[in-house]
Structure formats: C-alpha cells, structure tokens
Regions:
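Enzymes that bind and transform nitrogen-containing heteroaromatic metabolites
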Residues: 1-217
Length: 217
C-alpha cells in the first residue's frame, strides 16, 4: 500500500487560482491548468463516459491511465468536495452529482458535516474531522491493501507532505504562469529531499514530475 498524490500545477507552482465561485468552483484558470489531462482518451472515458475512442493519446494519456490504477480509497479536503460553497446544504452531494468518478471510499476532511454518503457505483463519502495521520489510518482500512490517494486540494496535500505521509508525488506542470492562487510548494522547502525523481515532457508541453520514496514510479 502506497500513499499517492497527483496534482496539476502551473509553472510557478499554483494548484488552484483565485476567484472560486459555485459556478466556477476551481477558479477561472482551472481549464488552463487541467486542459491536457481533460483532453486525454482515458479521462474522457473514465469521467465523461465517452466510449467513442476520442481524446489524445501519448504521454498525458499514459499518466491519466496511471491515475486511475490501484486506488482503494482517497482523502480530500472540504473545499474539493464543495463544502466551502455549500456548507449548510444537507442535500449537497459534491461537484459530481449522482455520478462521482471514484468508485471507492473517499474521506472528506471537515468539521461542517458528519456521516456517510453512499452511491450505487461503489463511491462512498465519509465526512470526518480528523488529522492527516488519523485520516490516513481510516483510509488504509477502507482501501483493503490497495493504494490511498490524497486527492487535494493543495492545502490538504501540504499537510500530508509536511508529516512525511506521502510515498509518491506526481505533479503535472502546465506550461502557464498564474501568479496567484494557492501554491503547492508554500512552506515545503526540501520536502522531497529523500525521494528519487523522474520527469517526462508530454506532447502538450506538460511536464510530468514524479517524486518517489522507492524505485517504483
């Protein structure tokens, strides 16, 4: 079992931009950050249900396919689920509505909501007020030997990195400069010093960098 992170960031390290609204939950620059990933054949099939074979193939698609492999549970922050915008709506089921793309248990770190939310496709959201380490213990039990993903946002990922809980950190660096937002690397000087590193440039210009605690990338 490994703890994995996969994030899209800009050249200057921003994983989300300012100006988040209920209509644009990830901010106005989200499409620029994730455009290469969303365009892949794997993403279109796994998230949009597009079985036509449309979408890009190549390096970006290989990483998109790897993103979905071997995950048994996930941990995410309240903002990624949408609770910052809908804190008092008991009917809020996340940005994905009735068709979340996870198909495994997800721990949502929050003090705003409790209980569980189950879907017929195997996705379940478990709302818990926990530290990073305690959340990981719960996720490990739910993953049943498979890997655990720390899904985001960047503030949540930083907590896990600062506590040394991440085994594999993959960032897809989009060839754009945002100059604002939430920076993944804030306060993380030398956090990857004990990792090996692998990098690869995709046809889109996206640079995929993976830091790993062992030789498995």
């Amino acid at each position: 079992m490994r703890v994995r992170v996969d994030l899209n960031i800009s050249l200057d390290g921003f994983a989300t931009s300012e100006g988040s609204t209920p209509e644009s939950p990830m901010g106005p620059d989200w499409e620029r950050l994730t455009g290469a990933y969303v365009a892949t054949r794997t993403f279109r099939r796994r998230v949009f249900g597009d079985e036509s074979g449309a979408g890009t193939v190549g390096v970006d698609d290989a990483y998109a396919a790897r993103y979905f492999e071997g995950i048994g549970a996930e941990v995410m922050g309240a903002g990624m689920f949408g609770l910052h915008h809908f804190p008092d709506d008991p009917e809020w089921r996340g940005w994905w509505g009735d068709a979340p793309p996870f198909h495994y248990p997800v721990i949502v770190l929050t003090h705003r909501r409790t209980g569980d939310l189950d879907f017929s496709d195997g996705t379940s959201f478990h709302f818990r007020d926990l530290s990073a380490r305690d959340a990981l213990d719960v996720a490990r039990d739910l993953a049943k030997g498979a890997d655990v993903r720390v899904g985001g946002g960047p503030s949540t990922v930083r907590q896990f990195l600062l506590e040394g809980l991440v085994d594999s950190l993959h960032v897809a660096i989009a060839p754009i400069i945002l100059g604002r937002g939430v920076n993944l690397w804030s306060g993380l000087r030398d956090v990857t010093r004990d990792f090996t590193v692998h990098s690869e440039v995709a046809e889109s210009g996206t640079v995929h960098v993976t830091w790993s605690r062992d030789s498995i990338l």
